[in-house]
């Protein structure tokens, strides 16, 4: 595999990397103007974390390759959206997540520049079960 940059995230516990996921879908960047070293990942396999089977996805992965992410445990889905994830919009994300997994945790960063509204959502069977509001810091605690 060639070395390059990637859109990725890692699940870390006690300083150890438990799982390192690299986005498999192309992001919205202009590839004509971007670094030629950018690489998409290929691994969508599940992993165990505290005896729970988990699958990782990033941003547009579930919209483009939903069949690659079938899981029986919990889907972890960090996204970057800078629009209001209101009830109807978060409901669309819940339905998309349900195509691959019965339970999903969607997390959006909170930042001023670039603007991102934050928020965290726990989806179960295509419905929003719990959420942390937009535009504020906090922790969403869910039982899986």
Give, region by region, the residue ranges found by the protein language model.
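Active-site catalytic loop in hydrolytic enzyme cores
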Residues: 2-73, 86-89
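Short acidic-glycine loop/turn motifs at beta-strand connectors
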Residues: 12-16, 123-127, 144
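Generic detection of short hydrophobic beta-strand segments and adjacent strand-loop junctions
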Residues: 47, 140-144
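CN hydrolase (nitrilase-like) catalytic-core segments centered on the catalytic cysteine
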Residues: 63-139
């Amino acid at each position: 595999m060639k070395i390059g940059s990637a859109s990725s995230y890692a699940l870390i516990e006690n300083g150890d990397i438990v799982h390192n996921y690299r986005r498999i879908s192309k992001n919205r960047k202009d590839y004509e103007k971007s670094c030629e070293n950018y690489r998409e990942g290929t691994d969508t396999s599940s992993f165990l974390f505290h005896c729970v089977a988990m699958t990782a996805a990033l941003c547009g992965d579930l919209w483009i390759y939903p069949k690659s992410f079938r899981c029986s445990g919990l889907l972890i889905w960090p996204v970057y959206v800078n629009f209001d994830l209101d009830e109807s919009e978060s409901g669309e994300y819940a339905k998309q997540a349900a195509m691959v997994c019965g339970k999903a945790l969607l997390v959006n960063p909170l930042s001023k520049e670039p603007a991102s509204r934050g928020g965290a959502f726990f989806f179960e069977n295509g419905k929003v079960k719990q959420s942390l509001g937009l535009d504020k810091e906090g922790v969403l605690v869910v039982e899986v």
